[in-house]
Swiss-Prot record:
Reaction(s) catalysed (UniProt annotation): 5-dehydro-4-deoxy-D-glucarate + H(+) = 2,5-dioxopentanoate + CO2 + H2O
EC number from the UniProt entry: 4.2.1.41
Pathway: Carbohydrate acid metabolism; D-glucarate degradation; 2,5-dioxopentanoate from D-glucarate: step 2/2
HAMAP family tied to this protein: KDGDH
MF (Gene Ontology): 4-hydroxy-tetrahydrodipicolinate synthase activity; 5-dehydro-4-deoxyglucarate dehydratase activity
InterPro entries on file: Aldolase_TIM, DapA-like, Dehydro-deoxyglucarate_dehyd
Organism this protein belongs to: Acinetobacter baumannii (strain SDF)
Biological-process GO terms, alphabetical: D-glucarate catabolic process
UniProt keyword list: Lyase
Enzyme class: lyase
Keyword Translocase: no
Assigned protein family: Belongs to the DapA family.
Protein name, per record: Probable 5-dehydro-4-deoxyglucarate dehydratase
Length: 303
């Protein structure tokens, strides 16, 4: 699959970001992860992002990273494209991008570099070097200390033919408006804010109709119901789900830092697809928070 083909795929549909399964010792659980992907695949996500933020990319060792990507590629071959997370320092991101391409992934999501702040010139060079190291498609993740301005994005689209996507987690509506209006269909645009469903309608209005759904990990039926309603401008359904489910979910998520990932793993366990614990420095939900989440999920019915 070339970069343009991947761009067309991620321009439509719901994007799945599966959690990464660990056993009770905190080691990667390959068989459980494989079963998870087999369970989620038939629900109709347009692409699957292995070892992304929700998949605890930041806590995987080099060998584990390779094993996660290889498992995803092997299980989903012929059914759904695999996009791998890759990031951190430039040379590490290049190594991971090359490894993902070698293992048969169809592209990467370029995660933020580590810790340090960087100039726009430095970010341009970082993205350019990663793009130049591979042939497949690269999606830039605009968040945290790794944010490009409009001028930098324009330069990179000219320098890097395989830069195909821009995932935004900044929430800066004016910036996204400028990007989509100026860059146009040269890139595909992905909404990437936590609990992205709440922001999906305004992002769609900006020309960014696609988003990453973390809740697809435990309520795939409802996640697809929401996406299809959004796509058809069924505001009665989207507003009902936001009010009755997503806003209460955010209240649970915001009780502790790191719950944006921990809550997703807890949800998977509640619906019978246990992915094991999160790794430090994240912490699992408290029992009270777990019970509140279980009660909220129960209101949706079977998935």
């Amino acid at each position: 699959m070339d970069a343009l083909e991947l761009k067309n795929i991620i321009s439509d549909g719901l994007l799945s970001f599966p959690v990464t399964d660990f056993d009770q010792n905190g080691d990667f659980n390959k068989s459980s992860y494989a079963k998870r992907l087999e369970w989620l695949a038939p629900y109709g996500a347009s692409a699957l992002f292995a070892a992304g933020g929700t998949g605890e990319f930041f806590s995987l060792t080099g060998n584990e990273y390779s094993e996660v990507i290889k498992t995803a590629v092997d299980i989903c071959k012929g059914s759904v494209p695999i996009i791998a997370g890759a990031g951190g320092p430039t040379r590490q991101a290049i190594e991971q991008a090359k490894e993902a391409e070698r293992l048969g992934a169809h592209g990467i999501l370029l995660m933020p570099h580590y810790l340090t702040e960087a100039s726009q010139e430095g970010l341009i060079e970082h993205v350019k070097q990663v793009c130049n190291s591979v042939d497949f498609g690269v999606i830039f993740y605009n968040r945290s200390v790794s944010r490009l301005n409009l001028d930098s994005i324009q330069k990179l689209t000219e320098m890097c033919p395989n830069l195909i996507g821009f995932k935004d987690s900044s929430g800066q509506i004016d910036m996204m408006t400028a990007v989509t209006q100026t860059i146009g269909d040269r890139l595909s645009y992905l909404g990437g804010l936590p609990t992205a469903e709440v922001f999906a309608a305004p992002y769609k209005a900006l020309g960014c109709p696609v988003y990453s759904s973390a809740v697809f990990n435990f309520i795939p039926k409802t996640a697809m119901e929401f996406y299809n309603a959004l796509r058809s401008d069924d505001f009665e359904t989207t507003n009902r789900l936001i009010k009755d489910f997503f806003l209460p979910l955010i209240k649970i998520r915001d009780r502790k830092s790191g719950y944006a990932v921990s809550m997703i793993k807890a949800g998977a366990k509640i619906v019978g697809h246990d992915a094991g614990p999160v790794r430090p420095p994240l912490s699992d939900l408290t029992q009270a928070d777990y019970e509140d989440l279980a009660a909220l999920i129960a209101t949706l019915g079977p998935q």
